[in-house]
């Protein structure tokens, strides 16, 4: 027993010494990195962060250290970019050097470097190019992408009509619609909202979305080499990701039986055709594991982000009934109450378009982009960032910039309207990030938000259960995403 105790103590001391040595070695090179608060061994700058509101902590540090500074999450340095000028300079002007994907261990450990979002190098380029082309040429089958979204908008309205103007929580049903659009893209089919298979898929996606924003997952990302061997929520998280991948692979088996390369029906068909096309290439990136992870990425990125934006949008329109009234007036005047909205209507709906943009700006759904990494030793301003260093561009610092938006903390569609009431574009609108690592589904997300939003407002008036002034619209802030507070509403048919 004494020998066991001594061995355990020696192991703990060794790990501690190695960690201290690692920090010390990194600190020796800090002269090349931007300035920042001095890190402590093992925990880095954790004490400078409010884990319940990391974006606010990062903005506060920018006031002290400037728009480019270094922060240690655990033992690893991260360069934080705060403000439009430095974010643009890094992601656009020096985009090729900042092209890497920084680590997010809770995801990396399950994706193993495959897929669209957390891959790097040539694999990432191949998967992104294929996915962009597939989505862009989505005349697969007999329906365009817009027609698929319009169909889902109609189904969403039918489902919402069943609430009969009674109070309900919109969280689940607003997630069903974008999830079904991804189902349509991936395997050319949609589900009824009460389908058991669909409900199980929604449950997997929702639980992991909630969990990736938890403090536990943030702890895992700081010390993955230790926590991965402990019991905890990360095990359930990984199991659910595997379940989503297995669900996709079952659909792949069905597609393999009826594949016609000359007439691809969906994303899976296109991917299977590429697998066949490159079957003699031993280094091909087109294989079933990559297909499963790409499909999982599309579900994760394409379901909860869109539904959360819609949910936040409805809450804001109840908070500001005068804005809702103006949207109703414009929709009635331009489209009427019976013609389904289409993308060609967008140019004729400047106020509605401004409201949609302001919702996305105001909520800053993703306060920072997913982490980047420099792919080589990179000269940036007065600093040299070593190859592989994580870089965190703060999108909220761009969309809440007082130089561009007169009242950035206030919800005001006027931020996107000129003096004539026409829609006004701005380079400071970056909810999908910037550069080559910008969201691959940006065009789809924009289409979904416009068609779902206009269809809902065309058919319903939004009624709050309390006085508008008493509605809480303060986001539930975490390290990764901003969520609206829970609420119920009544949808009154128009």
Curated annotation (Swiss-Prot):
The modification Phosphoserine is found at residue 131. It comes from the Eukaryota. Keywords: Acetylation, Endoplasmic reticulum, Fatty acid metabolism, Heme, Iron, Lipid metabolism, Membrane, Metal-binding, Microsome, Monooxygenase, Oxidoreductase, Phosphoprotein. It comes from Rattus norvegicus. Pathway: Lipid metabolism; arachidonate metabolism. Signal peptide: none annotated. The modification N6-acetyllysine is found at residues 253, 379. Its EC number is 1.14.14.-. This is Cytochrome P450 2C23. Induction: Constitutively expressed. Up-regulated by fenofibrate. Its cofactor is heme. Belongs to the cytochrome P450 family. Expressed in kidney and liver. Expressed in cortical tubules of kidney (at protein level). GO terms for cellular component: cytoplasm; endoplasmic reticulum membrane; intracellular membrane-bounded organelle. It is found in: Endoplasmic reticulum membrane; Microsome membrane. Heme binds at residue 439. A cytochrome P450 monooxygenase involved in polyunsaturated fatty acids (PUFAs) metabolism and signaling. Catalyzes preferentially the epoxidation of double bonds of PUFAs. Converts arachidonic acid (ARA, C20:4(n-6)) primarily to stereospecific products 8R,9S-, 11R,12S-, and 14S,15R-EET. Plays a major role in the formation of EETs and hydroxy-EETs (HEETs) in kidney. Via EETs may inhibit the epithelial sodium channels (ENaCs) in nephron segments, preventing excessive sodium absorption during high dietary salt intake.
